[in-house]
Amino acid sequence: MATFKDACFHYRRLTALNRRLCNIGANSICMPVPDEKIKGWCLECCQIADLTHCYGCSLPHVCKWCVQNRRCFLDNEPHLLKLRTVKHPITKDKLQCIIDLYNIIFPINDKVIRKFERMIKQRKCRNQYKIEWYNHLLLPITLNAAAFKFDENNLYYVFGLYEKSVSDIYAPYRIVNFINEFDKLLLDDINFTRMSNLPIELRNHYAKKYFQLSRLPSSKLKQIYFSDFTKETVIFNTYTKTPGRSIYRNVTEFNWRDELELYSDLKNDKNKLIAAMMTSKYTRFYAHDNNFGRLKMTIFELGHHCQPNYVASNHPGNASDIQYCKWCNIKYFLSKIDWRIRDMYNLLMEFIKDCYKSNVNVGHCSSVENIYPLIKRLIWSLFTNHMDQTIEEVFNHMSPVSVEGTNVIMLILGLNISLYNEIKRTLNVDSIPMVLNLNEFSSIVKSISSKWYNVDELDKLPMSIKSTEELIEMKNSGTLTEEFELLISNSEDDNE
């Protein structure tokens, strides 16, 4: 039985604040929602279930019941999931705020127990104190939290009562315990005080549950990668040829400087929290999805679908425009891909084609060449530490000759103006040389691959990990979407 879910169901009738905070989706009607086939704890109701992706952060951390409420731990609306969320670093004051939160929302005292007794003993068969009827009173205060690690300094902890055990290898979070950062004896005393108000029949169950959960060892934190995010929230703009992502957040006009101020209002100004929840709006943010994780994924797919036969062909057009040649056609893949990747692929394949045909005697794209597997490896190695080694292998497969102790290859360019300008810019020359050494060849390949992408400035993960305040600020400043999305292509092929 999910004690936290039961506590939310019964305690929601206690106060006006509880009616807002304890209204979770797990206690409502289930709606059909596809799940991610990942078993884990739902962060809103703390029960073990099949998880589905959240519309706020695109990570699977809610069950098919709670996803109906559209709540995310990155919202700025002070709902219960947000109140249980603490950002790194963890301090003793923040842990004390979590304990105060439990005592305010889920108190255990004589008045509360008598009220629940009157509610439960409406039937004659419910005179005894059985766990099935009083499970909501067996809610110990623990400092276990689900930890999300976006990077070394960007971590979020969602505190809750995570009962039982489950293999969370595919879940985006790990369960950690902060009892040592607080004070074991002090936390024991807090729970013993709560337990002393319970009927004798329930105290043993409370104590057993508390000691089992409060002494759990912490799991090793899991680094979140791009593959952990769902594809359901990704939107490909066919007009601008750029990927984007829909992010939905609960936004309120009330602001708090930090978490401590929010918890202070929870204790001293509950009406402010109620007003914030009543006036919050479910807001959609459309953000670009240009990040290093997506770049690596797209490069991997490009290498898989790449047709290296193009470097031996006589096609006059770009590699992405070939559609009637069974050895070179890749248009089916590039029709829904970022236009920058498409441009990079065209320039890279054209450059290798010009170099290869200038040095090796080849006839047609149907011929079998030893360089084909290397071209796939070259694309896969872009933006990795193996790039220099692969470029050298490609260079050595173009029959270089030694001139004064330096291996060089010939270069007879075709009619690609974009490639011509790119080589001039890279080598900083007025006219294109007809002979290239390894360093010049490598510089051109790296320049083509990094023409549109500065890896050092790219975020590692999607924009959906940003806080709601950051999204609002970026939207107001116009940086939520890219400047490239204003690009209008005049290519007849792009407008088909």
From Swiss-Prot:
The organism's place on the tree of life at top rank: Viruses
InterPro entries for this protein: Rotavirus_NSP1
Pfam families: Rota_NS53
Molecular functions (GO terms): metal ion binding; RNA binding
Coiled coil regions, renumbered to chain: none
Span list, region Interaction with host IRF3: 321-496
Subcellular locations according to the entry: Host cytoplasm, Host cytoskeleton
Chain location of the short sequence motif pLxIS motif per the record: 486-489
Spans annotated as RNA-binding: 1-81
GO cellular component, one term: host cytoskeleton
Location of the region described as Zinc-binding domain in the Swiss-Prot/TrEMBL record: 42-79
Biological role: Plays a role in the inhibition of host innate immunity by inducing the degradation of key host factors required to activate interferon production such as IRF3, IRF5 or IRF7. Associates with components of cullin RING ligases (CRLs) including CUL1 or CUL3, which are essential multisubunit ubiquitination complexes, to modulate their activities.
Subunit architecture: Interacts (via C-terminus) with host IRF3; this interaction leads to IRF3 degradation. Interacts with host IRF7; this interaction leads to IRF7 degradation. Interacts with host CUL1 and CUL3.
Protein name (database record): Non-structural protein 1
Species whose genome carries this gene: Rotavirus A (strain RVA/SA11-FEM/G3P6[1]) (RV-A)
